[in-house]
């Protein structure tokens, strides 16, 4: 029996909408990363973008477990300005309470996707919004009930 390898013309992409309200960040990010890669499909092909389009709403209400949400000594995100001594840091709690809370989910998912051109293409299929509104109603997304799959998914 030959190994099946999908062709780009055979790939069908679905649109999913996930409500992240009171959902644990790491569990959500790992599931979304698998869906963006297409690993939940039987026609998964590693070298093609066979994943689905994911819309995440209420990203500002995602939950962090343990001490990660603590603004003083919680999970720290680093960035570098490019100048000597220019390393900057901020905590996950500050980002979630700040102007762009959707960046926490985007960073978590991005770090679970392969770091190459295919990963960048797959990340372009992720749409994260801080509140409950999204402009993708024309695509008729299917609601993905992530919270009811496992009691540990919700906090």
From Swiss-Prot:
InterPro entries: Ribosomal_uL13, Ribosomal_uL13_bac-type, Ribosomal_uL13_CS, Ribosomal_uL13_sf. SUPFAM superfamilies: Ribosomal protein L13 (SSF52161). Keywords: Ribonucleoprotein, Ribosomal protein. The keyword Ribosomal protein applies. Part of the 50S ribosomal subunit. This protein is one of the early assembly proteins of the 50S ribosomal subunit, although it is not seen to bind rRNA by itself. It is important during the early stages of 50S assembly. This is Large ribosomal subunit protein uL13.
């Amino acid at each position: 029996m030959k190994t099946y390898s999908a062709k780009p013309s055979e790939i069908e992409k679905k649109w999913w909408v996930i409500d992240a309200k009171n959902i644990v960040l790491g569990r959500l990010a790992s599931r979304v990363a698998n869906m963006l890669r297409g690993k939940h499909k039987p026609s998964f092909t590693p070298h093609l973008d066979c994943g689905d389009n994911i819309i995440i709403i209420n990203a500002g209400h995602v939950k962090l477990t343990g001490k990660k949400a603590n603004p003083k000594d919680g999970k720290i995100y680093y960035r570098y300005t490019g100048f000597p001594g220019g390393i900057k840091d901020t905590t996950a709690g500050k980002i979630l309470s700040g102007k762009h809370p959707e960046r926490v989910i985007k960073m978590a998912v991005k770090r679970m996707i392969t770091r190459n051109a295919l990963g960048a293409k797959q990340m372009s299929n992720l749409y994260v919004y801080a509140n409950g509104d999204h402009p993708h109603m024309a695509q008729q997304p299917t609601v993905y009930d992530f919270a009811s799959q496992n009691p540990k998914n919700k906090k």
